[in-house]
Amino acid sequence: MKKSYTILAIIAIIVVAIYVMLPKERFAETVFPLGDGAKVSAYDDNADGGKSAVQFKSADSLVSFQCALGVDEKKSAWCGLVFNFDPNGEKKYHNWKNVDTLYLDIDIAGTNEINVKTWTFDPDVTDLKHPETFRLLLKEVPVKPGRNQIAIPFEQLYIPDFWYNDRGVKRSRNRPHHESVARVEISAGWNQPRGKNFTVNVREISVSGTSNRAYGIFLFIILGLMIVAIGRSHPVKEYDEKK
């Protein structure tokens, strides 16, 4: 019996060594500059009676966005910049299950905070005719004037309470659906002063992560070892009982 466990221990050590040596599969994807089929655009509140003013220009290597929120405090105001992977509604979503970091390389003026958002397709909630029904994941990001190179841990993007309330969705249904990312968005921070211009110039947005395939192989081997260990222990017990 001791010999069996010694052999299993040796095998386990070998498995761990193999796992350490397995090459980690890096996942990387660029949001901007734009990939095939993607589109960048700006939005404001004018269609809903707001007075926010937006200036927007897009080139291959730089997106320039400027906004001043409407000064009427009695009205809600909003503006932002959207990078859309599926502008034609063909469900060409991006699988970011292996993403662990979202990178921003941006120039900032006129604000000390931006909201960074991803919108994901949720088959139980999303109506393709209504973009706001995609699942929202949000991160408030502090910024400074000038160039900002920011790495955001992807797990820090959260589903805000107002999304659940607006959509009438139970909070227990909190799966982020990272496997179907439809859009990335940058918008004004919550405390942006009304009427004050703020500028976001986007040099690059990208994501990266490590595939967990090697970890899955490792667990599968460990499971196999456990089965072998259990199988080898049973004949010994039966032999002891017969004696």
Question: Each predicted region: which residue ranges?
Answer:
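Beta-rich carbohydrate-recognition modules and glycan-binding surfaces
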Residues: 2-243
